[in-house]
Amino acid sequence: MRALSLASLIGIASAACPYMTGELERRDTGTDDATAATEEFLSQYYMADNDTFLTSDVGGPIEDQNSLQVGDRGPTLLEDFIFRQKIQRFDHERVPERAVHARGVGAHGVFTSYGDYSNITAASFLGAEGKETPVFVRFSTVAGSRGSSDLARDVHGFATRFYTDEGNFDIVGNNIPVFFIQDAILFPDLIHAVKPRGDNEIPQAATAHDSAWDFFSQQPSSLHTLLWAMSGHGIPRSLRHVDGFGIHTFRFVTDNGDSKLVKFHWKSLQGKASMVWEEAQQVSGKNPDFMRQDLFEAIEAGRYPEWELGVQIMDEEDQLKFGFDLFDPTKIVPEEYVPITKLGKMTLNRNPRNYFAETEQVMFQPGHIVRGVDFTEDPLLQGRLFSYLDTQLNRHGGPNFEQLPINQPRVPVHNNNRDGAGQMFIPLNPNAYSPNTLNKGSPKQANQTVGKGFFTAPGRESTGRFTRAVSPSFEDVWSQPRLFYNSLTPAEQQFVVDAIRFENSNVKSSVVRNNVIIQLNRVSNDLARRVARAIGVEEPEADPTYYHNNKTTDVGTFGQKLKKLDGLKVGFLASVETPASIEAASELSKQLSEDGVDVVVVAERLSDGVDQTYSGSDAIQFDAVIVAPGAEGLFSTFSFTAPSNATSSSTLFPAGRPLQIVIDGFRFGKPVGAVGSAATALKNAGIQTSRDGVYVDKSVTSGFVDGIKDGLRTFKFLDRFKLDH
């Protein structure tokens, strides 16, 4: 259907707004169904083309398959407005991609407050138990272009918009709680360093090159975030399996003006899970859309991912209490110091209807805050408040990007901003200034006591001389990277070591590699020596200035069982030559589906009961691999000298593919198993059936399936990965 007129939309919004009826003091308790409210709002802008004739942009029916020309072979006429419109619109379809976070995927959902938190914040969306607020979330990678791989090793953006009844509130965060720099003035330097080279645009979406590690080694404030990115956090299993963080310290402010310092946390209710590096590289090559596909399919299947929102709450006097500055964005507050207070739950339950109109055009910025939330003096946050707004002028060609449907608040907008490119509304107030008498003083000023307006925390104050210098309270940038490294399991430490080795093996400058080891040695001599011996740098003596043995909790991505199995996939490797192998999948699927696990049946070719072929399958597509009974003939040890008709060789799939799926599944730490006679396939793969995470049974029994479920919850069996010592 055609979109409603903008004038009618203004009327609809005005009629529904409590502020327009004089109920300025009432605090709305929220909609009964925030999901329905999202659909109701966005559906006003839908354009459906069902059973219609093609029209021009101005509504006239047309045909556009042939240009208007002179005769059968003559030139195209300039008067062909249909041709000109079609080509011109095509030429201008793209907008400039984001300078960072260009590659992203989004979803709608709802946030439900666990209670009334007016004792800590005046924010309306946290003002009542059960109150629902529509949300939109965009996940992203940072460095790559819009067409880059989802599985590039990177920090992942986790930006959330709350469409509250007092305006839009954005938490523009990441899946890592700290950032590379302390001062926003360094942001162009950071991004120029990690982006591809200026002369050849290589490498794409990667930091395994000289300029990135040159910057990291010259700007040691980056070390903390760097170690997080080199761990499993840089290559998550899916976006459903990441936590999120607001990075900065913010303020909560009550109606009375009392303020607290807070840090925002999103905790995945699926649990955390990550890939290993070679697995992620293979995914990048085989399916660069892996992350967005996983999120989209989970929501389409009704397996809605969920996160809990929590905050660490600190007194204003605690700014330097913990041995570091709470306004330093390269620091975490360990949860042993300040536990997380849970505020509510977010459920993502609706995919966008149009990627460009919603996910690409959405603009988040830290300056989207509401009454009850306030900023701090964090210098990175202060700079982001300008940058995120400014960049949208370039992307959208004017200041009216807030009027796009995905960016519009769900409450009416009344101010004196006017005109600009792409103005979508028709303002009726001719007196666009304040104060005025000609429009009876409207729109009126709203503040802490009148109109439920935004207000700055009354206690904020700042004095001092002008200076360009790093605060002494920001200077220790090595203790917390060590805290992170100390807190990882030995296998996770090995993954970090291996990742830094890989990255620096691609660094050509020996000077840069030496500088990297100098900085790593200030964090950990163990880490520095293990990396140095692999990249041609002399192993250093300890530099213990910042060494300590402290540890914290919940910073890794391995070692904790998953909370849900929703959307995980088990590859069931069968053969069309043995129908019983395909039939065995039904019982497995029946039992695993109770936990939301999908069984994908793989065979030589498509037929009834077969989901995909060996030619299109790899271990990277599955979270567990099981060989079906009767299919073991496909898993004989591959040999190039074997007869051409050997069962391990076929024109239907690459040589040795079935056996390789089993081998890769095991070496990537996944649960693997076999039913009945198929146990020989594990033997051919060199897998001992006594190992943890290996499951064998005569049939698909409940005990066998329970073992697979437990293996999926473990997700990665870390004893399969070799340690340096």
From Swiss-Prot:
Biological process annotations from GO: cellular response to hydrogen peroxide; hydrogen peroxide catabolic process
Propeptide: 16-27
Coiled-coil ranges (or none): none
Residues of this chain annotated as glycosylated in UniProt: 50, 119, 447, 550, 645
SMART domains per record: Catalase
Induction statement: By hydrogen peroxide.
InterPro entries: Catalase (IPR018028), Catalase_clade2 (IPR024712), Catalase_clade2_helical (IPR043156), Catalase_core (IPR011614), Catalase_haem_BS (IPR002226), Catalase_immune_responsive (IPR010582), Catalase_large_C (IPR041399), Catalase_sf (IPR020835)
Catalyzed reactions per annotation: 2 H2O2 = O2 + 2 H2O
Protein name as annotated: Catalase B
Organism, as annotated: Aspergillus oryzae (strain ATCC 42149 / RIB 40) (Yellow koji mold)
Lineage: Eukaryota, Fungi, Dikarya, Ascomycota, Pezizomycotina
Gene: catB
